[in-house]
Structure formats: structure tokens, C-alpha cells
């Protein structure tokens, strides 16, 4: 087996007076910083809002207020619930409705729904989701570690591509001449994105995060990602899924983000979601996942004990 190791040294220089600059010293639009994609808006539009693609300003403020109130209510509760989690780690009440005020992250098709093929929907529903049982209400298998979700096994997640998770929504963008790197808080995912139009990896090289290539269209960064492996299911997709991301800096504290997903086996048509990335002044700390990960072993051991009854 051949292992290829790429080492990149990334140095960011911030001189006095340049902190608010929108361009890097080498002339690229500056997207650097720590950004959060947390939002209370669901991926797909709820049935109750089927004919309402946008919130009003007042409604958006109410959605944000209710999301925070729900978290505060849970913190105040003295009754332990199954699967409860220290609220100090959670961000579910800190999200904002996107700049467009859409009622779903899915922006196209216009109905706010992912356009699954029958095969794609069946695959998605049968796949161990990145989300846990607490989030989905569905019991995952426990015959082997591979039955559990990728995030639960400390491998990877889709937090950059989707947003709205209840924790680990911070992403640090670092730039160097010819490269842009996105380091995600959860599971230490680091996407090194060349910007020099180099050839893609061979089709036989497939990765959890795929193979990304980026370029600038005016002030917008466009990133195309292919070469995924078949060990993950991005909304039920196959390894042939193609993702196109667009990052547009709006002001010092805001980036508009749009993702377009194409996979003819899984979706009836390409579909897109929109979210807003907002600057955060905090730091991104280490996510210790494998360290002290007693949960996975305990789940499997509990399943074996149940089988012996």
C-alpha cells in the first residue's frame, strides 16, 4: 500500500491596520477567520410551512428567540432524560436564521425538499446516520462498530456541508498562496483545497472528505469536491456524488454559503442549500473524541449482553 503525505506550512500574517482588510497580501479575497454555520433553520421545509418559503424579519427573530428559550428550559430542568448531554457543549440556542430568512436550508427545488429518487431515499433511510439515536429517534444497529454513525465513531461528519448541528459548528478558514484550508471543529476534519487548477486525484483514490479543487469567480470562492468513498452517505448519496460550494464574503462578519449536490442515482435533480456563516471571536479547541470514548464500547457490550438473555 502506498501512502502519500502532503505537508503544508500555513502562515498567516496580520499587520496593524490590515485586520479588517478584505484581500490577502497576495491579492485573493480574504475569507480567513473562525466561522459558525449554526442555525435553527431545518434542512428541509416543515410541512406546516409548505407554502411559506421565507420568514418575515419578525418571524425570524421569534424563531431565534424560541430556539434559545428551548435550550434554557432544558438547562433549568432537574429531571434527567435518556441521552441527556451537558448543555455547556451544545450550541442549539445560539444559531441565527440565514440572511435570506428562508424557512429551510434547501433553497432549490423551490418546495424546500430534497428530491430523492426511490432508490436514494431507501438508501438514506437504511444508512447509519451521522446523527445519533437521540437526534433521529431511530435505533441504530449494534452488531459491529460499522453499524454506528461515523460521527459516533469519531471518524468524520458533514457539519461543513450542512450546518445546524447542535454542537461543533465552528470552522476555521486559513489561506496561503495557492491554497485554502477549512479546519472543522468536529473530529479535526481539515480540507486542504488547492487553488491552482491542478489535475484531480485518480478515480481510484477515494476519501471520506473527497478530493477538492477550488478557484475564484470574482469575489466568490468556488470549490468542487468529488472522489468520495462508499463508507459515507451524504444524504444517501453514492460515492459518485459531486458537491459544488460557493463562499461569498458579504462583510467583515458574514459569508454567504451555497452548496449544490449532484448524484443522479440518489436525487431526481441537482439540489442546493443556502446558509450564512458568521464570524466568531472565540477559539476552536481540540475535540477529544476517541480519548475516553466509552460510549461505543458500552453500546456494543450492552447489545452482546442483551443477546445472552
List each language-model region with its residue ranges.
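N-terminal secretory signal peptides that target proteins for export/translocation
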Residues: 1-3
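Bacterial N-terminal signal peptides
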Residues: 6-17
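PEST-like low-complexity, intrinsically disordered acidic/proline/serine-rich tracts
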Residues: 20-309
Amino acid at each position: 500500500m502506498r501512502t502519500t503525505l502532503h505537508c503544508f506550512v500555513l502562515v498567516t500574517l496580520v499587520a496593524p491596520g490590515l485586520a479588517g482588510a478584505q484581500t490577502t497580501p497576495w491579492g485573493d479575497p480574504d475569507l480567513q477567520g473562525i466561522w459558525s454555520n449554526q442555525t435553527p433553520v431545518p434542512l428541509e421545509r416543515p410541512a406546516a410551512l409548505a407554502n411559506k418559503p421565507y420568514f418575515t424579519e419578525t418571524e425570524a427573530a421569534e424563531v431565534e428567540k424560541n430556539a434559545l428559550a428551548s435550550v434554557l428550559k432544558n438547562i433549568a430542568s432537574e429531571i434527567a432524560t435518556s441521552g441527556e448531554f451537558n448543555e455547556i457543549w451544545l450550541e442549539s440556542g445560539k444559531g441565527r436564521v440565514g440572511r435570506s430568512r428562508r424557512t429551510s436550508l434547501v433553497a432549490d427545488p423551490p418546495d424546500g425538499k430534497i428530491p430523492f429518487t426511490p432508490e436514494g431515499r431507501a438508501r438514506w433511510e437504511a444508512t447509519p446516520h451521522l446523527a445519533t439515536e437521540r437526534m433521529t429517534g431511530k435505533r441504530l444497529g449494534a452488531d459491529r462498530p460499522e453499524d454506528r454513525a461515523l460521527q459516533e465513531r469519531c471518524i468524520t461528519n458533514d457539519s461543513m456541508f450542512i450546518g445546524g448541528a447542535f454542537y461543533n459548528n465552528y470552522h476555521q478558514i486559513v489561506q496561503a498562496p495557492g491554497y485554502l484550508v477549512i479546519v472543522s471543529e468536529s473530529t479535526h476534519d481539515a480540507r486542504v483545497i488547492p487553488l491552482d487548477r491542478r489535475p484531480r486525484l485518480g478515480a481510484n483514490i477515494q476519501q471520506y472528505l473527497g478530493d477538492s479543487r477550488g478557484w475564484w469567480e470574482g469575489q466568490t470562492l468556488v470549490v468542487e469536491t468529488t472522489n468520495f468513498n462508499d463508507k459515507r452517505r451524504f444524504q444517501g448519496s453514492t460515492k459518485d456524488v459531486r458537491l459544488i460550494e460557493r463562499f461569498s464574503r458579504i462583510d467583515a462578519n458574514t459569508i454567504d454559503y451555497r452548496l449544490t449536490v449532484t448524484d443522479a442515482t440518489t436525487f431526481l435533480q441537482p439540489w442546493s442549500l443556502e446558509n450564512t456563516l458568521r464570524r466568531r471571536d472565540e477559539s476552536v479547541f481540540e475535540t477529544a473524541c476517541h480519548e475516553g470514548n466509552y460510549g461505543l464500547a458500552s453500546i456494543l457490550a450492552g447489545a452482546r449482553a442483551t443477546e445472552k438473555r
